[in-house]
Amino acid sequence: MNHQQQQQQQQKAGEQQLSEPEDMEMEAGDTDDPPRITQNPVINGNVTLSDGHSNAEEDMEDDTSWRSEATFQFTVERFSRLSESVLSPPCFVRNLPWKIMVMPRFYPDRPHQKSVGFFLQCNAESDSTSWSCHAQAVLKIINYRDDDKSFSRRISHLFFHEENDWGFSNFMAWSEVTDPEKGFIDDDKVTFEVFVQADAPHGVAWDSKKHTGYVGLKNQGATCYMNSLLQTLFFTNQLRKAVYMMPTEGDDSSKSVPLALQRVFYELQHSDKPVGTKKLTKSFGWETLDSFMQHDVQELCRVLLDNVENKMKGTCVEGTIPKLFRGKMVSYIQCKDVDYRSDRREDYYDIQLSIKGKKNIFESFVDYVAVEQLDGDNKYDAGEHGLQEAEKGVKFLTLPPVLHLQLMRFMYDPQTDQNIKINDRFEFPEQLPLDEFLQKTDPKDPANYILHAVLVHSGDNHGGHYVVYLNPKGDGKWCKFDDDVVSRCTKEEAIEHNYGGHDDDLSVRHCTNAYMLVYIRESKLSEVLQAVTDHDIPQQLVERLQEEKRIEAQKRKERQEAHLYMQVQIVAEDQFCGHQGNDMYDEEKVRYTVFKVLKNSSLAEFVQSLSQTMGFPQDQIRLWPMQARSNGTKRPAMLDNEADGNKTMIELSDNENPWTIFLETVDPELAASGATLPKFDKDHDVMLFLKMYDPKTRSLNYCGHIYTPISCKIRDLLPVMCDRAGFIQDTSLILYEEVKPNLTERIQDYDVSLDKALDELMDGDIIVFQKDDPENDNSELPTAKEYFRDLYHRVDVIFCDKTIPNDPGFVVTLSNRMNYFQVAKTVAQRLNTDPMLLQFFKSQGYRDGPGNPLRHNYEGTLRDLLQFFKPRQPKKLYYQQLKMKITDFENRRSFKCIWLNSQFREEEITLYPDKHGCVRDLLEECKKAVELGDKASGRLRLLEIVSYKIIGVHQEDELLECLSPATSRTFRIEEIPLDQVDIDKENEMLITVAHFHKEVFGTFGIPFLLRIHQGEHFREVMKRIQSLLDIQEKEFEKFKFAIVMMGRHQYINEDEYEVNLKDFEPQPGNMSHPRPWLGLDHFNKAPKRSRYTYLEKAIKIHN
């Protein structure tokens, strides 16, 4: 327990009393002493290190500070005078400082009693908050007379920044420790001892490669079980060699699973740091969500090896995976009384072993090959011999070199309707002889296996942590692979500690146990674990992976240096041609020439670089930065190369990044002759852009730009405009100034100067002109002003078919001033249908999908429908095509139900009865939508079904408004059979029949109504049921029949029972309860619906 929390708890009123001295024998987990951190200096005491439990396997390095365990002592002198906490000097384990903390503990409610507080502290002086280290420890007060009488307690704790000490505030009564007769104190000295075993720490500079020779894998999310599997496959060296040899030269780097696996294996072999797996999971074609879905390691192993095996076909390593992992077994059924036997040989790549109720792996194998007796109701159908008593079992023909054993730790619990984890103890040996389970043994090659990998899960069915213990070279020297951290461990930690089950030793947690084992055949050990050297990796693969690394390093460097650079986007004048909107170009469609420029470089340096890149001398180019104006437009502005040449780019751009510049150049046809750009006087000249509008084509034509003095009159520009547009001189023109979106002003007076004719004259102003032609009045948009107004209201809308999931739809350009009918007419033309046969739906604001339907008399505009969309968000509406006019359709309601056809098959249909109608109207609509049987009554009925049972038949005059839909109920329409049209209510009855298997609450299948007669023999009822369900006699013999009432069932004696209608009537006084029903008890052969959500869907590799 962390002692700071302990002190805080004791300060609260009404705290729980701490254990008295006689309670000292309780387990560490039985006390809730919470902890606190003090950093008092060591005031007295000495530390002694002892070899204790040290293991020669562990001490791989000379530097003992990296060891995994240690025993150290701390002697506190003048113990009787101890008044505050004391700390021992540090003992380094896993390169972290561990200290003994001792303190006297006083209790406000018991001032004459105190106890000894004893804690283990880890890494307390570190400023880091990200470190953690799990450890187990034995805390002991030494008895100097008899060590066997020393007092000890165990702890197991995850040490981290917030809880960096753990132990007991009432470890032992003060009076016992200081009693000379007890043997704990000698000359006022008490010796405290700690034996600590620590896992490799996380969040600190742990060098896995240095301490083990291997590196780990980064944890990518809920796929950490995948890390365990990948390490297991990596250390199957023969497989690793084969993966390297797969030809991947032409593979897509992002989609090739073999290449991604080669990459992971190569980095595990050569990297000094943990290796990432994101490229591998990306190659699987996984969605974002997929990589966080907890799955069974067997499932991923099988799918991954299948994928690789298929891609090895036709290569030099074809057959490697079957050679390593495939075994053969035979499933047999042997009849006892007739000469009949059925054998089926099959391959397997892993074996699933049941562990429930089994002590060890041998008992599981015995259970796996145990003979099952097929007798009684479970006899075997031996064809012409009929049902026979038989024996069923499996025998192993061969066992593979690499044996994957899946321990069934996770099982379905029918009581809770979910999977549970079995944490029972289950033992497995380091050496596993399996000859006794083979049908035929080979004396020259006994089936003796060596344990190679132990895959371990800590936690429950809902989640937890995965690690793998590996014996990489098969020599008994084990390592623990915990995601990115790899550490050496003892054989005991790898094997015995992962048996599972309860253990008094807190170093083994109850929920931590093995779920998969990998054994390698002893005779194949050297072959499977053959050394993999650089010579086994194709040179072209090495070069490709190294080039990838170089590119990644370059990109990483660019990201690190990105703050030093800015982007300059150059737009040339040819990008203005063809633009049909406001300003000079569409920012989403324009093609820029992008330069990466140092922010502190000068304009002069950039112009020089730009000149060289674009191939124009500096006197043939001029830069015009695109400047955002206050009215929302973006126009070119003057940049003085001479005056601003020494200014930095970031200064000139006013921190705009990317910075867009219009690059003016000499006409390329004149550039070769040495022509230069005309002079531009920034104080007296202005640059204007010209557009010509053609009302006949409703289009704009870019007519270039001009320099002109500010004092120039509008009339002086008319000849230039006529020339640029290809009009004859003196053509009468109408001129407009394009001010901003939805504001285009006509220029009335051509005899005034530019600064008076144009509003706030600036460089980059746009003049739009058109012919003054009376024929323009016949055009839909006769003037440029109307064109720009229409453009302002123009909107692209995506229309998606509501009835098609994920329909991409089609785009229609509309005006947001359109009303409902105008929109419907436009969409109907696109769909080649009648506007009245369309219904439209708004888009839901909170998610992508159809919302409420629009009525055909909607009075708003398209703008009103789209007002909640964000500016750059795609505008979307939904539609569905109708079979009746919308005016009629809106007076009807949508009614989803099931139609049961004459072949006793169900199909879902949607009907549209009058919303104020009754069941009769619904049935009439159904007659129009379905095909009735030839030999039936032609009359329909509406049933209500809950949990696969019919709970009622609705009367024809019942209002549809009373039928409320719900997820728990289903409405079904069916044709009334001829024998059920007229019922003799005195002697006959319609009863509900439903299917179940063993439990009446587990109904399934299609329920139905059946006519029965008072006094008829039940065999007659059975014949009608068999005929209706069209079941073979042999299958029908397995059915049992029961009368079910109030959740209880009573089986019918088929040979004796005669129908009594009272058995199917509600109990007197309980008319509100459902009627009894006839249950058909038989096995459900239909595939069960998945119990699981999307998060538990089957794993799949898509590439």
Swiss-Prot record:
Glycyl lysine isopeptide (Lys-Gly) (interchain with G-Cter in SUMO2) cross-link located where?
A: 870, 883
Q: Where in the cell is it found?
A: Nucleus; Cytoplasm; Nucleus, PML body; Chromosome
Q: Keyword set for this entry?
A: Acetylation, Biological rhythms, Chromosome, Cytoplasm, Developmental protein, DNA damage, DNA repair, Hydrolase, Isopeptide bond, Nucleus, Phosphoprotein, Protease, Thiol protease, Ubl conjugation, Ubl conjugation pathway
Span list, region Necessary for nuclear localization: 71-206
Output the superkingdom of the source species. Eukaryota
Sequence ranges assigned to domain MATH in this UniProt record: 69-196
Expression sites (tissue/organ) = Widely expressed. High expression is detected in brain, bone marrow, thymus and testis.
Q: Which Pfam families match?
A: MATH_2, UCH, USP7_C2, USP7_ICP0_bdg
Q: Does the keyword rRNA-binding apply?
A: no
* GO cellular component labels: cytoplasm; nucleus; PML body; XY body
Q: What is its EC number?
A: 3.4.19.12
Catalytic site positions: 224 (nucleophile), 465 (proton acceptor)
Question: Glycyl lysine isopeptide (Lys-Gly) (interchain with G-Cter in ubiquitin): where is this cross-link?
Answer: 870
Q: Identify its protein family.
A: Belongs to the peptidase C19 family.
Protein name, per record: Ubiquitin carboxyl-terminal hydrolase 7
Organism listed in the record? Mus musculus
- Biological classification of the source: Eukaryota, Metazoa, Chordata, Craniata, Vertebrata
